[in-house]
Design a protein with these regions (language model features):
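Low-complexity, small/polar and acidic-rich linker and loop segments
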Residues: 2-195, 209, 215-224
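Short, mixed-charge aromatic SLiMs
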Residues: 141, 443-458, 698-702, 758-775
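Long, charge-dense tracts
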Residues: 189-190, 219-327, 331, 335-336
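Eukaryote-specific, cytoplasm-facing alpha-helical/coiled-coil scaffolding segments in long proteins
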Residues: 216-227, 448-455, 657, 802-806, ...
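Hydrophobic, often aromatic-rich secondary-structure segments at membrane interfaces
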Residues: 300, 304-419, 424-696
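Short low-complexity linker/loop segments enriched in small residues
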Residues: 644-758
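Hydrophobic alpha-helical segments
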Residues: 748-842
């Protein structure tokens, strides 16, 4: 009769005969003994425990072999794709890379192929990590369908359907509550949870579905704050709240009561250090790595519904939907990373760099050096950034202060950015469509509906099509178009930033403009579904995303979608819904194309520009804070140059490129002129005279989001009284300087009057400085439709109270304004009402 001892000996002999090494034999033996012990402790006889353990070990080895084969196949596919893309860099005309710093460099061209795997570059065929991530996000959020409009974010980022949130948790955990909406959301979430597993496995990863799965994202800051010394309170709470029937070792074994305290000690350290203190891979009898991976995926700790709510209330940030949406964002990143770089992204990234070096070396030492520079300064920091390899310390007071102040300054300073964004995005969309041979833009009606007249319906259509409008699921996103930084920092400051973006129409415009491009794309494909691939004027653009004639034929054979009468789309997501054989691949290509092109037409701050400005420096260090300040508001202009500089390189001839750049430059100069004049009017001033070089220079710079530098064409200081050195240092440094002057200015003046040799009398000007400080840094004070009224009715009144000389100073400033810029005020400073309407005077 089989027993544990005889099976172990038999198994070891068999493994030796099949060529297994000692280390692997020991791993399998340990696994058998662990499973046998589990069954024995569950009440099974020794013989039955050995039999069941034998079955588990063999099943595990079979699954392991299958997963190994699957991962190998995925890696080979990724490797082949990477080699093909790098070879494209070898063969591409070097003239396409004149925008990348090394004129005529083959090494740069080869290394740029690697960078294009992380972020879209139209000079290379295929998808990138960022686009793949958007594809995954869209497919997952689409599963919520109409319910997303009931429990997403509403006006000013407020959570909709708050009363239903606790019941959503209970429904996910299998408890019937009688709440119809909660049931619908829970069912949709469970589909999302299963789909993330399926998508990860299809990409080459290894995950198992979990019944009634509900993620939990505990905040390191709140754990430290409320968890007691060394986590004593947190550990007691977890011992009481965790569902120990479901919280098991990764192999399914029960975690014994005597093992739980040590386990929670290690989990506490891992979660409160944001993963910096990893669980030892040898811990828990070799289960450490698996436990760490499950913690990272929020799949290790399990609670019933009521205890999950207790845990969330005490140790988590945000609400239930924030947790669900956050999990989607995390899994979208991981799935996209595996799709792009295979099951072992770090190893693949190193292989990519090795291939780049090998190919560049064939073209000489200079090409190799140029390639190394791109890998070091672009690829490596971009890869580290998307994988959070140098994440900010979650406990850092300095980091929270820097990011929080960045959000406050965004709220105070970007309230009129929509003056440039709205006309600019229409101009850029027209330029991109011309580049792609897509014809004139016909989506103005859709834009108006998405912005004002039919918002909810357009949001629902977008979500169902796999194009998630970020403001529906995130309380803050629009400011990242300009800074790339507005989605971090203390929650209150994020809300301030987002409130300004929404009230100034920046959020609504960005949402509407991007959806207009996306919907027009799907409508265009529907209208052209009767044409052969070679007859499509925009076929070359499709080929950049790896789309072939066969792909087009498969997509145009789909049943069109008609969300409302007279509106028909050819949607990539229907390739999945209608069970086409290669539906997932079709969806990735066509959806990726639409995502990437919409972000070219309506641009935002890019990953590469952020890395170029900040590297991987963190704002919780002194040098990182200084660099953070320097980079604010410079990310978008640099991104603008990168996006459209490289897009123009798609023209085949030098004259074609120059013509496209000239047309875009002229168009954006007109946009800058319009935005500049609208901004002047919003501040109570007449439009600027336009018959001078200074205005044209300011308009040109404004068209590229550099309007603050345009002021120096008229005067040595800008509208805030800052010189070029202050602008270069960034708003955080300027804020620190102004704060220091406000707090300590009178101290130094008093010391000088008392301790100096002069007889001058000390006069405090702190009140006047405080009003100017508030005028410049009050959140929301720059919102275009409220700015003039706030200036005249609030800040001018306060200035009169704080400074007896305020009226005289205003008259002096008005004369200087007229002398430097040539325009006057239609709403005179200090007056309670406008004296006339704005006038243009030459």
């Amino acid at each position: 009769m089989l027993n544990q001892v005889s099976f172990v000996q038999c198994m070891q002999d068999g493994l030796k005969e099949r060529g297994f090494g000692k280390k692997r034999i020991k791993e399998i033996t340990d696994q058998f003994e662990e499973r046998a012990r589990f069954y024995s402790e569950s009440g099974k006889s020794d013989d039955m425990a050995a039999t069941l353990a034998q079955r588990d070990v063999f099943d595990f080895m079979s699954r392991e072999q299958f997963e190994r084969i699957k991962r190998s196949a995925a890696m080979l596919s990724v490797q082949a794709s990477n080699i093909g893309r790098i070879q494209a860099g070898v063969n591409a005309p070097v003239s396409k890379f004149l925008m990348d710093g090394k004129r005529g460099s083959r090494g740069t061209a080869i290394a740029r192929a690697a960078v294009s795997m992380l972020e879209h570059d139209p000079r290379f065929t295929g998808l990138d990590y960022q686009t793949r991530k958007e594809n995954v996000r869209g497919a997952l959020y689409a599963l919520f369908d109409a319910t997303l409009g009931e429990v997403g974010k509403g006006f000013m980022g407020r959570q909709k359907g708050k009363a239903h949130l606790p019941n959503i948790v209970r429904e996910i955990k299998g408890e019937a509550t009688g709440d119809a909406l909660a049931k619908q959301v829970a069912d949709a979430w469970l589909k999302v949870a299963d789909t993330t597993v399926d998508m990860m496995n299809a990409a080459g990863g290894s995950m198992n579905r979990l019944a009634n799965y509900l993620p939990q994202a505990q905040s390191a800051v709140r754990m430290v704050k409320d968890g007691g010394e060394n986590g004593a309170i947190w550990k007691k709470d977890m011992l009481d709240w965790l569902d120990w029937e479901r919280t098991r070792w990764p192999d399914g074994s029960i975690i014994k009561p005597e093992e739980r305290a040590d386990l929670l000690d290690r989990v506490w350290l891992t979660l409160t250090t944001d993963g910096a203190n990893k669980i030892d891979v040898t811990a828990f009898r070799g289960r450490g790595r698996a436990v760490g991976n499950m913690l990272d995926d929020h799949r290790f700790l399990h609670f019933n519904g009521e205890n999950w709510l207790k845990m969330h209330a005490k140790y988590s940030d945000g609400n239930v939907m924030d947790t669900l949406f956050g999990h989607i964002e995390q899994m979208s990143h991981k799935i996209a990373m595996v799709e792009q770089f295979g099951p072992n992204p770090e190893m693949t990234a190193n292989n990519v760099k090795s291939i780049v070096r090998a190919e560049a070396a064939k073209h000489g030492a200079k090409a190799l050096n140029d390639a190394e520079a791109v890998l070091k300064n672009k690829f490596d920091p971009m890869f580290e950034t998307v994988n959070r390899m140098n994440a900010m310390d979650p406990h850092s007071v300095m980091g929270a202060t820097v990011t929080g102040m960045s959000n406050v300054l965004t709220s105070a300073m970007l309230g009129s950015a929509s003056f440039l964004a709205i006309p600019g995005d229409f101009m850029q969309t027209a330029a991109v469509r011309a580049l792609n041979n897509q014809g004139l833009f016909g989506g103005v009606g859709t834009y108006v509906k998405a912005l004002a007249t039919d918002m909810q319906a357009q949001k629902q259509i977008a979500t169902q099509s796999g194009f998630i409008m970020d403001e529906v699921v995130m309380s803050t996103y629009a400011a990242s178009r300009w800074t790339g930084l507005a989605t971090v920092g203390p929650q209150l400051t994020r809300r301030l930033s987002e409130a300004t973006m929404r009230l100034s129409l920046m959020s609504g415009h960005t949402r509407a403009a991007r959806w207009t491009v996306q919907s027009e794309f799907m409508g265009m494909m529907f209208r052209d579904r009767g044409r052969e691939f070679g007859d499509l004027p925009y076929a070359p653009m499709m080929q950049r995303y790896g789309i072939t004639a066969d792909d087009w034929n498969a997509l145009r054979a789909l049943q069109p979608w008609e969300p409302k009468a007279g509106v028909q789309f050819l949607r990539p997501i229907d390739a999945i819904h209608q069970n086409v054989g290669n539906g997932a691949a079709l969806y990735r290509k066509f959806q990726g194309m639409i995502h990437a092109e919409s972000r070219t037409a309506v641009p935002e701050a890019t990953l590469e520009a952020g890395v170029a400005l900040r590297g991987t420096m963190r704002p919780d260090t002194l040098i990182g804070a200084l660099v953070h300040s320097f980079s604010m508001y410079k990310n978008f202009p640099m991104s603008f140059v990168m996006i459209y500089g490289r897009s123009g390189m798609m023209k085949q001839t030098a004259m074609g490129r120059l013509g496209w750049y000239a047309a875009l430059g002229a168009g954006m100069t007109l946009v800058g002129a319009l935005g500049t004049q609208m901004r002047e009017i919003s501040r109570g001033r007449d439009p600027l005279p336009m018959d001078n070089v200074g205005f044209m220079g300011k308009a040109f710079l404004s068209g590229g989001a550099l309007s603050i530098w345009g002021d120096f064409l008229f005067s040595g200081v800008n509208a805030f009284g800052q010189g070029p050195q202050d602008v270069a240092a960034g708003p955080l440094v300027s804020f620190l300087g102004d704060s220091t002057s406000l707090v300590l200015g009178d101290t130094f003046a008093f010391a000088d009057s008392v301790g100096g040799l002069s007889d001058k009398e000390f006069k405090s000007n702190t009140g006047a400085k405080a009003v100017e400080f508030a005028r410049r840094y009050t959140p929301g004070a720059s919102i275009w439709w409220a700015r003039a009224a706030l200036e005249r009715q609030v800040f001018d009144r306060l200035q009169d109270l704080a400074d007896p000389q305020a009226a005289r100073k205003r008259q002096k400033q008005m004369r200087k304004r007229k002398q430097d810029y040539g325009n006057e005020y239609w709403w005179t400073p200090g007056q309670s009402a406008p004296s006339r309407v704005p006038e243009y005077r030459r």
